[in-house]
Amino acid sequence: MSAKINSKKLEMFDLLKKFIDNKQNLFFLDYRGLSVSQLTDLRNKIEGEHGALKVVKNNIMKMVLKEKNINIVDSCLVGPTVVVTALEEANVIAKIFYDFVKSSTLKVKGGFVLGEFYDEAKVQAYSKLPTKKESISLLASVLKAPVSKLARTLKALADIKN
């Protein structure tokens, strides 16, 4: 029976290892009090933005993180835990689960973003950053403003001469 348990744990270890392979962004959430349908809804929203959500066993996750040399605060792996990964824009994923926090019992424990541990407050601040698309739009409008002003000035000058 012991061999059966160990093989299951080893299989779970390998699955979690593959789950976080090549991921630079990990978030740890406490899903206590969420219904299955709420968790499924959260998972669908996260997957819609190129992220993934997995319910994990804390001890096995600790071993995986240790093997990957990822250092996080132990409190991130206490109680019911889901790990959320982001393939692209991690702050978009963070916005999704912070929107979810407002209407549910979901709690953010912390995260690991681009090689640095983020506590709950840092993850929340990170979630408020503009997305890549919003940043590009803002930059475009900033670059466009002087050109538009010059065009209006030249048009006004031409109107005065006529």
UniProtKB/Swiss-Prot annotation:
Keywords: Ribonucleoprotein, Ribosomal protein, RNA-binding, rRNA-binding
CDD domains for this protein: Ribosomal_L10
Keyword Ribonucleoprotein annotated: yes
Positions of transmembrane segments: none
Gene Ontology, cellular component aspect: large ribosomal subunit
Domain of life the protein comes from: Bacteria
Entry's Gene Ontology BP terms: translation
One Pfam family of this chain: Ribosomal_L10
MF-aspect GO terms: large ribosomal subunit rRNA binding; structural constituent of ribosome
PROSITE patterns, alphabetized: RIBOSOMAL_L10 (PS01109)
Family indicated by similarity: Belongs to the universal ribosomal protein uL10 family.
Assembly behavior: Part of the ribosomal stalk of the 50S ribosomal subunit. The N-terminus interacts with L11 and the large rRNA to form the base of the stalk. The C-terminus forms an elongated spine to which L12 dimers bind in a sequential fashion forming a multimeric L10(L12)X complex.
Described purpose of this protein according to its UniProt entry: Forms part of the ribosomal stalk, playing a central role in the interaction of the ribosome with GTP-bound translation factors.
Name of the protein in its database record: Large ribosomal subunit protein uL10
Gene giving rise to this polypeptide: rplJ
